[in-house]
Swiss-Prot record:
<dbReference type="GO" id="GO:0005524">
    <property type="term" value="F:ATP binding"/>
</dbReference>
<dbReference type="InterPro" id="IPR003796">
    <property type="entry name" value="RNR_NrdR-like"/>
</dbReference>
<dbReference type="InterPro" id="IPR005144">
    <property type="entry name" value="ATP-cone_dom"/>
</dbReference>
<keyword id="KW-0804">Transcription</keyword>
<keyword id="KW-0862">Zinc</keyword>
<comment type="similarity">
    <text>Belongs to the NrdR family.</text>
</comment>
<feature type="domain" description="ATP-cone">
    <location>
        <begin position="49"/>
        <end position="139"/>
    </location>
</feature>
<keyword id="KW-0678">Repressor</keyword>
<keyword id="KW-0479">Metal-binding</keyword>
<dbReference type="GO" id="GO:0045892">
    <property type="term" value="P:negative regulation of DNA-templated transcription"/>
</dbReference>
<keyword id="KW-0863">Zinc-finger</keyword>
<keyword id="KW-0067">ATP-binding</keyword>
<keyword id="KW-0238">DNA-binding</keyword>
<dbReference type="GO" id="GO:0008270">
    <property type="term" value="F:zinc ion binding"/>
</dbReference>
<comment type="function">
    <text>Negatively regulates transcription of bacterial ribonucleotide reductase nrd genes and operons by binding to NrdR-boxes.</text>
</comment>
<keyword id="KW-0805">Transcription regulation</keyword>
<protein>
    <recommendedName>
        <fullName>Transcriptional repressor NrdR</fullName>
    </recommendedName>
</protein>
Length: 156
């Protein structure tokens, strides 16, 4: 690291601590040339995920879009914001763990729906109705029937 005062590249680490919920390391350094102390942060570098949309366009993955969609789906429902954060985090890490750099928006939606189903079924239907673009009530009812069938199987 270059010293911010004299630009020397010779420094020693005086102190190291976890920062940002252990996603980074904060280091206090001292320049061996001029004695100036300064702080550096070390973060894990993750490669960007690219979302391939339905129309074939590509854009950078933004976790905020998932979170915003979940918040809208869960309005006036007994779902805590932390649960939505947890779903968003799980989806992001599932995508990153897949090893792919390009992910279809369809795959992202499926990951979200699979996790949301276990949190709140009404919110799941709301999310699915936007994600799956139901054209009529029959499609909505078919989705709800799938939930009922899953519930009956899990009760057995």
């Amino acid at each position: 690291m270059k010293c911010p005062k004299c630009s020397s590249t010779h420094s020693r680490v005086v102190d190291s601590r976890h920062a940002d919920d252990a996603n980074a390391i904060r280091r206090r350094r001292e320049c061996e040339n001029c004695g100036t102390r300064f702080t550096t942060f070390e973060h894990i570098e993750v490669s960007p995920l690219i979302v391939v949309k339905k129309d074939g366009t590509r854009e950078q993955f933004l976790r905020e879009k998932i979170l915003n969609g979940l918040v809208r789906s869960c309005e006036k429902r007994p779902v805590r914001y932390q649960q939505l954060e947890d779903i968003t985090n799980k989806v992001e890490w599932q995508l990153r763990d897949s090893g792919q750099t390009e992910i279809s928006s369809r795959d992202i939606g499926e990951h979200v729906m699979n996790l949301l189903m276990h949190v709140d079924q009404v919110s799941y239907v709301r999310f699915a109705s936007v994600y799956k673009e139901f054209k009529d009530v029959d499609q909505l009812l078919a989705s709800m029937q799938g939930i009922l069938n899953d519930n009956k199987r899990s009760d057995l």
